């Protein structure tokens, strides 16, 4: 970590709905003693900083302020939420060209500040933008993490509580994997409840494959439902970012579903994709390769192929438009 354990610093880049929700979650959580906010709309960051600072009167002491890229120099963590929002009817992959351009204008000044901490990326399409952050920054792969399927996994676990009647989502050990987007899938074959395979529980309780497919599909499409109703999703992903941030800042060695770089895991290479991984103060410590069945392995391969094509096309377009 770049600062002492007793004083940790986070810089947020992007003060939109996701960014401000994340800032609030961090204020409530009490991790990081210093929190700076960078955005092109400087007045908004100043207002949010003042508002959030008021909240510390009820939570934890914290220095919160409108920051500049130069403030990243001694930060432990830079969190990127800036980007064009996903509109109704638009997929996350549709955002790639717009947000690659925005991202390139962010990563350069962060790195030029002397920043030597960890990047956490949440802007969509997150797997592609995490890869691009790694490429643009020149950082070691371990120091670049995407929020990946963390929110999707939470949605699956919540859905499983409704199906099983077991009310605590933390009792559900199951993961959504692959792209954070339309090609993601539920790794049901590796899911457990209290150590028991979830598929055994489902069979015993008369849950059909159609029921499981519907739950997976509902999870996959939940973001679209929320976007159609209120214009954007932000509370869920903000909570996910706060959880990942805590694992980094508290050096937890926690297993979390994130977007991680592949070096042979699942037969994949040179791609960031959603998988459980060990997250700690050094960043992404280790990928946990989930044992997938044949159908799930095929889905993981297809999801990676989808991402790689869009990534290649997006980076090529960015280079041509320079």
From Swiss-Prot:
| Binding locations of NAD(+) | 18, 39, 44, 69, 83-84, 105, 122-124, 147
Cited InterPro entries? L-lactate/malate_DH, L-lactate_DH, L-lactate_DH_AS, Lactate/malate_DH_C, Lactate/malate_DH_N, Lactate_DH/Glyco_Ohase_4_C, NAD(P)-bd_dom_sf
Q: Name one GO molecular function term.
A: L-lactate dehydrogenase activity
* Residues that hold beta-D-fructose 1,6-bisphosphate according to the record: 157, 173
Give the activity regulation note: Allosterically activated by fructose 1,6-bisphosphate (FBP).
Residues modified as Phosphotyrosine are 224
Q: Which GO terms describe its biological process?
A: glycolytic process; lactate metabolic process
One family from Pfam that matches here is: Ldh_1_N
Task: Kindly tell me the pathway this chain contributes to.
Answer: Fermentation; pyruvate fermentation to lactate; (S)-lactate from pyruvate: step 1/1
**Keywords from the UniProt entry:** Allosteric enzyme, Cytoplasm, NAD, Oxidoreductase, Phosphoprotein
So what EC number does this one have?
A: 1.1.1.27
Subunit composition?
Answer: Homotetramer.
Q: Which family does it belong to?
A: Belongs to the LDH/MDH superfamily. LDH family.
In terms of HAMAP family, this protein maps to: Lactate_dehydrog
| Name the UniProt record assigns to this protein | L-lactate dehydrogenase
- Organism lineage string: Bacteria, Bacillati, Bacillota, Bacilli, Lactobacillales
């Amino acid at each position: 970590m770049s600062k002492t354990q007793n004083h940790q610093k986070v810089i947020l880049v992007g003060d939109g709905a996701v960014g401000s929700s994340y800032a609030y979650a961090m204020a409530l959580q009490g991790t990081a003693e210093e929190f700076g906010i960078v955005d092109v709309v400087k007045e908004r960051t100043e207002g949010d900083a003042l508002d959030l600072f008021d909240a510390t009167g009820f939570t934890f002491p914290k220095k919160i302020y409108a920051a500049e890229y130069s403030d990243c120099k001694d930060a432990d963590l830079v969190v990127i939420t800036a980007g064009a929002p996903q509109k109704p009817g638009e997929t996350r992959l549709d955002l790639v060209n717009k947000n690659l351009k925005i991202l390139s204008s962010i990563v350069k000044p962060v790195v030029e500040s002397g920043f030597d901490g960890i990047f956490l990326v949440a802007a969509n399409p997150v797997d592609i933008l995490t890869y691009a952050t790694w490429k643009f920054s020149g950082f070691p792969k371990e120091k670049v993490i995407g929020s990946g399927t963390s929110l999707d996994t939470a949605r699956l676990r919540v859905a499983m509580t409704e199906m099983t009647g077991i009310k605590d989502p933390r009792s559900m050990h199951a993961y959504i994997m692959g792209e954070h987007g339309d090609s993601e899938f539920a790794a049901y074959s590796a899911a457990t409840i209290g150590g028991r395979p979830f598929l055994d529980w489902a069979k015993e309780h008369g849950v059909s494959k159609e029921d499981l497919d519907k739950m997976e599909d509902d999870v996959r499409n939940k973001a679209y439902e929320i976007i159609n109703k209120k214009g954007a999703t932000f509370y869920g992903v903000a909570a996910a970012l706060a959880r990942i941030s805590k694992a980094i800042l508290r050096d937890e060695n926690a297993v979390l579903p994130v977007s991680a770089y592949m070096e042979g895991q699942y037969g994949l290479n040179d791609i960031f994709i959603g998988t459980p991984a060990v997250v700690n103060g050094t960043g992404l410590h280790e990928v946990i390769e989930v044992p997938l069945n044949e159908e799930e392995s095929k889905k993981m391969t297809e999801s990676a192929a989808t991402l790689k094509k869009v990534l290649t096309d997006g980076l090529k377009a960015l280079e041509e438009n320079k």
